[in-house]
């Protein structure tokens, strides 16, 4: 069963290599040097752009996380109020049923 991802009880095992590779592809050295030379001129500028893009993405994720947190808290408060309301309705229905039983004579007054 080694090298498989989540095989079912009666399914055939699926090799893990079909989903991902654990080895990085090697790039030819000649092309690598040409790419490094081309990137070397604007290396600092591209690095700054990458950092600003990364900062924007992180800021976006944190703001979305804060919004999700606020929504979850609000939903928790609403759920608490609904549960409390349901319990109040249940108690009111029980007391009403007792009152009706007493008034119709099915149950003696307590």
Curated annotation (Swiss-Prot):
Q: Name one GO cellular component term.
A: viral envelope
Q: Which InterPro entries match?
A: Chordopox_Fusion/A27
- Keyword check for Disulfide bond: yes
Q: Which domain of life is it from?
A: Viruses
Gene Ontology biological-process entries: fusion of virus membrane with host plasma membrane
The alphabetized UniProt keywords are:
Coiled coil, Disulfide bond, Phosphoprotein, Virion
Instruction: Keyword check for Coiled coil, yes or no.
Output: yes
Q: What does this protein do?
A: Structural protein involved in the envelopment of mature virion (MV) to form the wrapped virion (WV). The wrapping consists of the addition of Golgi membranes to the mature virion. Participates in mature virion (MV) movement within the infected cell. May play an indirect role in MV-cell fusion.
Q: Which family does it belong to?
A: Belongs to the orthopoxvirus OPG154 protein family.
* Subunit and interaction comment: Homohexamers, covalently linked. Interacts with OPG144 and OPG153.
UniProt name for this protein = Protein OPG154
- Lineage summary: Viruses, Varidnaviria, Bamfordvirae, Nucleocytoviricota, Pokkesviricetes
Q: Which gene encodes it?
A: OPG154
